[in-house]
Amino acid sequence: SNTSRPARTAKPKPLRYGVRCIRSPYRNGFGFAVRAGLEVFEGDAVAIMMADGSDSPTDLVAYFRLLQAGYDCAFGSRFMPGAKVYDYPRYKLVLNRVVNLGIRLLFGHGYNDTTNAFKAYRRVVIENIQPLLSHHFNLTVELPLKSVVRGYSYGIVPVSWTNREAGVAKFSLSNETGSRYLFIILYVFLERHLSRGDYHRDGQ
């Protein structure tokens, strides 16, 4: 978002690190911030990472290799052999596993960490899963579920995750948050079963 600490501290870095800092034209919200970036990114693929350091840049190499191997999407799992998770709050961990199990059973895609924001996509995927509807953290499930339902291939690798050491997480657990996630999950589920393939990559 425009007012977050990462957004403010990113301003002096472009000349030193080659980082391009953009200001979102939308109101605050995780989903809006990511969508603003997806509208202007350059290149053949894009990776989405948290700005608080919880995701490891080293795992980007594994994502890149998946895309090089021909997959349309590169997904990471924090809960498979080889993955490492540090200081995940227990109540959030329990809820995470329950939600991801439900999504896995509902969509039958065999992926156990759909809610993880850290993923990479080819440009063609981002272009063909529009329009994106999520304003908030529910974008973390809209992106991968639409990609899978619309027929794009994906590879999964173990990744590491470390709880932030400073600052306050913007994500909070509430009935409002749950309803937003449920809306997106049901929206994509209904697309899968009622659209008769109108949005599938083979039907576009």
Where are these regions (language model features)?
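Acidic donor-binding segment of Leloir-type glycosyltransferases
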Residues: S1-I22
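A short, conserved beta-strand element in the Rossmann-like catalytic core
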Residues: S4-R5, S54-S56
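Aromatic/hydrophobic pocket-lining residues that form π-stacking "cages" and hydrophobic walls in ligand
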Residues: A10-P12, Y63, L143
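Hydrophobic helical membrane-anchoring modules
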Residues: L106-G108, L132-Q204
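Acceptor/aglycone-binding surface of glycosyltransferases and processive sugar-polymer synthases
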Residues: I22-V40, A45-I48, P57-F137, R164-L182
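Active-site acidic Asp-centered loop
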Residues: S1, M49-A51
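Hydrophobic anchor at the start of a short beta-strand
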Residues: V19, V46, Y154
